[in-house]
C-alpha cells in the first residue's frame, strides 16, 4: 500500500526575485562551474542551500533556510495540497511533456515490497544527504518514483485540476519549462490516494536520498515521541506513471580516469566483441550507437581514436557474470560493460566515484572530458527503457551505479517539505 499525503510546501516568495534566477539542477548534477554560476545569479539561489561552498556546509544550509524563512524569502503554504508538476522539454530534436504529482509519500523499507530500488548506491552521497537532513530538517529535493497505471486513472484525476491557475511557471537555463499547480481540493486528493494505495513504486531518481531518509526516519523514531503522521515518516516525492509518454531515459556514459586503453586491451576485447574503427567525432559515435540500438553495443573514445564494439555471443561471456541475476539483467549493456569490459578485460577493481570513474549524460561532454585530460577513456552506451527498469526492479535486482538518467530532472528550489519533529501530515 502506498500512502501519499498532501503537505504545506515551503516556496520562494516574490521577495526572493525572479524564479529563473533561483532554481537549480539537483545537487548531484551541479558541476563546480555550475555552482559558481548559480551563486552569481542571486544571493538567494537554491544552490546556496543544497550545495553550499562553505566548509561547514550543513550548518550554512541550515542557517540560510532559517534566515530566509524569517526574512520572508521563503514561506510555507497556508493549506496542505498535492502539486501537479509538468515539464515541457526537447531532447534529440523531439518535444515531450511529462506530468506527475508531488506529494508526501510514506517511507517503506525495501523488505516491505512497496518501494523498489533499481540501482546500486555509493556510501559517500548517502552520508552527505543524511548530514544535510539532520541539519536542515527539510526535504530539500523530491525523490522521483514511477508506478504502473496502464488504465490512465491518475491522468484522468489530474485533468480535473488542469483548469486551475499555476502557482509556478518558469523556464530553466536548459530550456525546460516547469509548471506547478496546487491542488488543495480534498476530493481530488482522496481520489489520488485511493488510486495509489494498491500501487508499488520504483525509484527513478534519488536512491541515495531515499536510503538516507530511511536512516533519518529511524533516528527520529528512536529519539522523539512520534506518531505514524509524523512528517519524517514521509518524503516529498514526485510520482509519474511509467506509461507517461514524456518519461524519457537517457544513458549515463562512463569515463575512466586512471585506466588507459592499450593495444593489449583491444586484443582482449576482440575475444568478445566485433570491433569497428570509428571516426573520432561526436556525430560518428552517436550515429553508431543509434544504428545498433537493440544490440549489445558500445562506443569507446580515447583521445583521437574511437571504436564501436558489438557483442559476439552471450554464451561466451556467461561465465564472466559475477552476480546472481536474471538472464534479462545479464543481457543489459551496463551489466556487460561492468562484468566483461571493466572487471575482466580492464581489471579495474573497485571504481571510486570521482577518483576513478566519472559519469556524463551527453556524448559531447564525455568526449570533451577525455580531450581535456580529465579522463583517459570514455565508454558510451544506449539508454535502457523505463519498462525494462520496472521489470528488473520488481525482481528485486539492482543495476550498476548510475545505469539510468531519467530526463529531465525535477528542478530544485520549487518546493520544500518540512520534516521537523513537530510537523504532522
Q: What feature does the model see in each segment?
A:
Residues 1-425:
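Surface-exposed, charge/polar-rich loops and edge strands
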Amino acid at each position: 500500500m502506498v500512502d501519499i499525503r498532501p503537505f504545506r510546501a515551503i516556496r520562494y516568495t516574490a521577495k526572493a526575485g525572479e524564479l529563473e534566477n533561483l532554481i537549480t539542477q539537483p545537487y548531484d548534477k551541479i558541476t563546480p562551474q555550475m555552482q559558481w554560476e548559480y551563486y552569481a545569479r542571486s544571493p538567494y539561489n537554491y544552490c546556496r542551500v543544497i550545495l553550499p561552498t562553505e566548509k561547514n556546509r550543513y550548518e550554512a544550509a541550515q542557517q540560510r533556510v532559517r534566515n530566509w524563512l524569517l526574512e520572508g524569502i521563503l514561506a510555507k503554504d497556508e493549506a496542505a495540497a498535492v502539486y501537479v508538476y509538468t515539464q515541457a522539454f526537447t531532447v534529440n530534436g523531439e518535444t515531450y511533456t511529462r506530468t506527475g504529482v508531488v506529494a508526501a509519500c510514506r517511507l517503506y523499507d525495501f523488505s516491505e515490497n512497496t518501494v523498489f530500488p533499481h540501482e546500486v548506491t555509493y556510501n559517500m552521497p548517502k552520508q552527505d544527504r543524511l548530514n544535510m537532513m539532520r541539519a536542515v530538517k527539510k526535504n530539500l529535493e523530491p525523490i522521483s518514483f514511477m508506478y504502473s497505471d496502464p488504465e490512465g486513472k491518475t491522468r484522468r484525476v489530474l485533468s480535473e485540476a488542469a483548469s486551475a491557475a499555476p502557482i509556478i511557471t518558469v523556464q530553466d537555463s536548459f530550456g525546460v519549462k516547469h509548471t506547478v499547480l496546487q491542488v488543495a481540493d480534498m476530493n481530488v486528493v482522496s481520489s489520488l490516494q485511493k488510486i495509489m494505495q494498491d500501487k508499488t513504486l520504483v525509484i527513478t531518481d534519488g536512491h541515495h536520498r531515499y536510503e538516507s531518509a530511511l536512516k533519518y526516519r529511524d533516528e527520529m523514531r528512536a529519539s522523539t515521541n512520534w506518531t505514524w503522521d509524523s512528517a519524517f515518516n514521509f518524503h516529498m516525492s514526485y510520482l509519474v506513471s511509467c506509461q507517461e509518454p514524456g518519461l524519457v531515459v537517457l544513458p549515463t556514459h562512463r569515463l575512466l580516469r586512471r585506466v588507459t586503453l592499450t593495444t593489449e586491451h583491444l586484443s582482449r576485447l576482440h575475444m568478445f566483441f566485433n570491433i569497428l574503427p570509428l571516426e573520432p567525432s561526436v556525430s560518428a559515435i552517436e550515429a553508431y550507437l543509434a544504428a545498433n540500438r537493440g544490440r549489445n553495443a558500445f562506443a569507446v573514445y580515447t583521445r583521437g581514436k574511437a571504436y564501436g564494439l558489438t557483442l559476439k555471443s552471450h554464451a561466451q561471456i556467461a561465465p564472466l557474470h559475477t552476480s546472481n541475476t536474471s538472464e534479462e539483467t545479464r543481457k543489459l549493456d551496463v551489466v556487460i560493460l561492468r562484468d566483461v569490459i571493466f572487471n575482466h578485460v580492464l581489471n579495474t577493481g573497485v571504481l571510486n566515484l570521482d577518483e576513478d570513474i566519472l559519469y556524463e549524460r551527453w556524448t559531447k561532454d564525455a568526449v570533451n572530458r577525455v580531450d581535456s585530460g580529465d579522463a583517459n577513456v570514455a565508454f558510451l552506451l544506449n539508454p535502457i527503457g523505463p519498462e525494462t527498469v520496472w521489470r528488473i526492479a520488481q525482481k528485486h535486482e539492482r543495476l550498476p551505479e548510475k545505469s539510468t538518467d531519467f530526463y529531465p530532472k525535477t528542478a530544485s528550489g520549487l518546493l520544500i517539505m518540512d520534516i521537523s519533529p513537530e510537523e504532522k501530515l
